């Protein structure tokens, strides 16, 4: 079985993330969405809560599962029996950091390949941090996050003081 890992902090999952997951699900036998923590970020929700939101919006994808990932991606990939990491690229600016990460992962797990999927043009500007900022300032995030979690995202990420 060809298993791929689609890792991220998904704080929150966006329509761009979901598009990459859907497209990856057509390329691989099984896709594991790995919800991790970024030491440089303080998410509003726990990894388990973010995983539940992703499960809700990927429920129609039979070959996609969602797991909380702790520790290194390479260790998680080994545990899952995966030899592929799928990453979305929005713009050339994403490539440099993703390339570095892919090279590090390959150093730690030589059998692990990274596959880059270019974002659809309508998602090329989209990021979780932009969604958080828009929601915190009372803006409409419709179309930026999956419909199935729109109200949840509005409630969690909106704040009257405008702080994220």
Swiss-Prot record:
Residue positions binding ATP: 9-10, 17, 88-90, 98, 123-129
Source taxon at top rank: Bacteria
UniProt GO MF annotations: ATP binding; pantetheine-phosphate adenylyltransferase activity
Positions bearing the site annotation: Transition state stabilizer: 17
CDD domains: PPAT (cd02163)
Localization terms from the record: Cytoplasm
Top EC class for this record: transferase
Coiled coil: none
Biological process annotations from GO: coenzyme A biosynthetic process
Cofactors required: Mg(2+)
Chief location of this protein within or outside the cell: cytoplasm
Reaction equations catalysed: (R)-4'-phosphopantetheine + ATP + H(+) = 3'-dephospho-CoA + diphosphate
The enzyme's E.C. designation: 2.7.7.3
Record keywords: ATP-binding, Coenzyme A biosynthesis, Cytoplasm, Magnesium, Nucleotide-binding, Nucleotidyltransferase, Transferase
GO cellular component, one term: cytoplasm
Binding site for substrate: 9, 41, 73, 87
Pathway(s) annotated for this protein in UniProt: Cofactor biosynthesis; coenzyme A biosynthesis; CoA from (R)-pantothenate: step 4/5
Keyword Ribonucleoprotein appears in the UniProt entry: no
Gene3D superfamilies, per database record: HUPs
Its biological purpose: Reversibly transfers an adenylyl group from ATP to 4'-phosphopantetheine, yielding dephospho-CoA (dPCoA) and pyrophosphate.
PANTHER family, per the entry: PHOSPHOPANTETHEINE ADENYLYLTRANSFERASE (PTHR21342:SF1)
Description of how the protein assembles with itself and partners: Homohexamer.
Family: Belongs to the bacterial CoaD family.
Protein name: Phosphopantetheine adenylyltransferase
Gene, per the UniProt record: coaD
